[in-house]
């Protein structure tokens, strides 16, 4: 996106966003562009949904194009995603490290979508989020990986400008996270998301992020700047 905002191994990055803000699609675009060994814990979408999106992002296909290609007998895409391991089974936060350790290829990036769907023995929301945030931080540090965790926040809280640290049950997330990013979207008259803004809410390192992105079908891209006329 033409921005300098480094994220380092050993860091927990939390993305706070309200429901239906395309947060999963955003991180799918990210990891697909990096194509680094990735463990993607997806607890909200079905395997069919998640892989359909990944293929569309990679190939730039519409749903109709994907359906036509899929109907062909020689359709094959697995080799394009040998860097990706998707897991759909929710687990306790403490079990995540064991799952990663058992992978044949150590991941460089771990995605958790989303934190609220992880299992916990705690019924109290504060204790649950404290446990999960602490475990994700441990995974990032012990395995020297980047952990990106999505955390849902209410629309009213986002509209009031509240950060994740001021939402009930989320103080420990803010305490543990190396970086906290907020995601907001704008829609057209038909209700389709057309743009999104990613901003830094907290960062232990130097640097801030405030970027406007354009939603182009299934891809999320930086807006193209109009060409300047040549002088003279």
Feature-to-residue mapping (PLM):
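Cytosolic-facing regulatory segments adjacent to core modules
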Residues: 2-4, 25, 29, 36-106, ...
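Pre-Walker A (Motif I) flank of P-loop NTPase domains
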Residues: 8-13
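The Walker A (P-loop) glycine that initiates the GxxxxGKT/S ATP-binding motif of P-loop NTPases
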Residues: 16-17
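Conserved glycine(s) of the Walker
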Residues: 22
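Conserved H-loop
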Residues: 43-45, 145, 149-152
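Flexible beta-alpha connector loops of hexameric P-loop NTPases
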Residues: 85-87, 119-130, 159-165
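C-terminal regions of RecA-like/P-loop NTPase motor modules
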Residues: 94-110, 139-143, 155-232
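Helical hairpin unit composed of two closely spaced alpha helices linked by a short loop
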Residues: 107-146
């Amino acid at each position: 996106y033409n921005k300098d905002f480094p994220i380092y191994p050993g860091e927990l990055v939390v993305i706070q966003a309200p429901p239906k803000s395309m947060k999963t699609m955003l991180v799918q675009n990210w990891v697909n562009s990096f194509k680094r060994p990735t463990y993607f814990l997806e607890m909200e979408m079905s395997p069919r949904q998640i892989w359909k999106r990944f293929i569309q992002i990679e190939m730039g296909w519409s749903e109709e194009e994907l359906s036509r290609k899929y109907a062909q007998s020689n359709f094959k895409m697995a080799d394009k995603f040998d860097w990706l391991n998707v897991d759909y089974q929710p687990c306790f936060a403490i079990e995540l490290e064991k799952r990663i350790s058992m992978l044949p290829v150590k991941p460089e990036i771990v995605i958790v979508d989303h934190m609220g769907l992880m299992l916990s023995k705690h019924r109290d929301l504060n204790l649950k989020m404290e446990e999960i945030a602490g475990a994700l931080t441990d995974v990032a540090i012990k395995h020297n990986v980047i952990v990106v965790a999505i955390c849902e926040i209410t629309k009213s809280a986002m509209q009031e400008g509240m950060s994740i640290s001021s939402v009930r049950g989320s103080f420990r997330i803010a305490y543990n996270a190396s970086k906290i990013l907020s995601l907001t979207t704008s829609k057209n008259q038909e209700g389709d998301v057309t743009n999104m803004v990613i901003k830094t809410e907290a960062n232990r390192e130097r640097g801030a992020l405030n970027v406007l992105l354009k939603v182009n079908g299934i891809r999320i891209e930086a807006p193209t700047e109009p060409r300047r006329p040549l002088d003279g």
